[in-house]
Amino acid sequence: MYAVIKTGGKQYRVSAGDKLKIEKLEAEVGSEITFDQVLMVGDGADIKMGAPLLRGATVSATVLNQARGDKIKIFKMRRRKHYRKSQGHRQYFTEVQIGGITA
């Protein structure tokens, strides 16, 4: 069984037991969270689709970790003008493990 959930402005296809890195959520490590924005649930040939969301469908998950991603470097430059600007960014994320899907 799998589901398509929406969180942090992105959509993820998840199954029970999957580990997932999503945009940062305000939750303690080890706590149980519930995703109620479920777009689709599938089990073999039986597929339920929402318009846009499925009513009563939820996906439960456990928070494994709160961390920051790898550093990306932003570098702007104008040729021949001696203009250089460098900046770095590390995005916060939450790592979760999908527990169960109810439809």
UniProtKB/Swiss-Prot annotation:
Keywords for the protein's UniProt record, in alphabetical order: Ribonucleoprotein, Ribosomal protein, RNA-binding, rRNA-binding
Stored Pfam families: Ribosomal_L21p
GO cellular component: cytoplasm; ribonucleoprotein complex; ribosome
InterPro entries cross-referenced by the UniProt entry: bL21-like, bL21-like_sf, Ribosomal_bL21, Ribosomal_bL21_CS
Entry annotated with the keyword Transcription: no
Gene Ontology biological process terms, A to Z: translation
One Gene Ontology molecular-function label: rRNA binding
Role, per record: This protein binds to 23S rRNA in the presence of protein L20.
Record-stated family: Belongs to the bacterial ribosomal protein bL21 family.
Subunit record text: Part of the 50S ribosomal subunit. Contacts protein L20.
Stored PANTHER family: 50S RIBOSOMAL PROTEIN L21 (PTHR21349), LARGE RIBOSOMAL SUBUNIT PROTEIN BL21M (PTHR21349:SF0)
Protein name: Large ribosomal subunit protein bL21
Species, as recorded: Thiobacillus denitrificans (strain ATCC 25259 / T1)
Taxonomic lineage of the native organism: Bacteria, Pseudomonadati, Pseudomonadota, Betaproteobacteria, Nitrosomonadales
Gene name per UniProt: rplU
